[in-house]
Amino acid sequence: MAETATRSDSGMFWKATTYKEQYWDGYLAARPKYSSDFYERIVDYYKAHNPSPPTPTVAHDVGTGPGQVASELCKYFDKVIASDPNSTHLAVASARNEKSGLNHKITWTEVSAEDLNSHYPAGSASFLAAAECLPLLDVPRALNTFAHLLHPNGTLAAWFYGRPVFSEPTVAAKCQPILNDIIDLTFEKVIKGAPPAHKTTWKRSTDTLYSFLDNVAFPTETWRDVYRFKWNPHLPLSVVGPNACDYPIEPSSCIDPEREKVVEAKDPHFWEEVWDIFEVRRFVECLLPNIEELKSKGVYDHVEVKYKELEEAMGGANAKKEITWPVVLILATRV
């Protein structure tokens, strides 16, 4: 079995609190599949900037969730450290990787991304992945921690995808506004009813996502060779829209064009899925682990009307439509 370190956490505004295999099967099925060429882009960058890393090579998977990125990193690194502030997520990830025979390579650590530097020594890692988590963090603190963990020439890879988007223009014109309404109505009560500390986190996250992570700064004394790859940047990266929020959304940018390279591509087939209404609905509902409890209280009755409207717009219960994603990938090298 893999090692597991523990640390309490009380600051999560989203977390699953019980290990339900059915929920996690649905969660992973409802997420986009990171393609092999996506991982190859990351690994090629890592090898080009770090041709002779210390051995054994160590990679961190920060905010591991159900552990699918940790599994992939096992192909490229001798040892993987997968961390998450939620003990349930770690239990899920460990169980899933035990089945695939990978746990002998993985150490599971219950800790927030910002506090990893209290668990692992400086310069102890060659690579660090932050998948679908950076906007949820205190970014300056997290980047300081990542810089602490990486040895010189080590690689940071941070990526995030947004809401699913109907890729065919005529379908998108009919269906996307309804899906956007469904997502906003689903999250409206969660966000507007959040306590002040969680509201601050939502605000920070929303600003970062509406900035397409352009507001994430990489200081010259710590990072070099910063690349920002964006797929479908004409689409919103934030899952929630303004109607779900009761605070101003303030995008910004701190990109330094003299030292950072931005590469953009409009690709309606990027990470393409073909979904029916059930699969679209599964994506939305897996975002909130307690959705069934809320539905049983009648909180989301008004959303059911919208789902019916979307089903009709898609062409019926069995109709399948092409789905794509807005995605950003940031690669940076430790000085």
Swiss-Prot record:
InterPro entries tied to this protein: Diverse_substrate_MTase (IPR051052), Methyltransf_11 (IPR013216), SAM-dependent_MTases_sf (IPR029063)
Q: Does the keyword S-adenosyl-L-methionine apply?
A: yes
Q: Kindly give the CDD domains that the UniProt entry links to this protein.
A: AdoMet_MTases
Q: Gene deleted: what happens?
A: Does not affect the methylation of the naphthoquinones derived pigments and only abolishes the production of pleosporalin A but not of the 2 other final products.
Keywords annotated in UniProt: Methyltransferase, S-adenosyl-L-methionine, Transferase
Database matches in Gene3D superfamilies: Vaccinia Virus protein VP39
Give the protein name, as stated in the record. Answer: Methyltransferase pgmE
Q: What is the lineage of its organism?
A: Eukaryota, Fungi, Dikarya, Ascomycota, Pezizomycotina
Q: What is the name of the gene encoding this protein?
A: pgmE
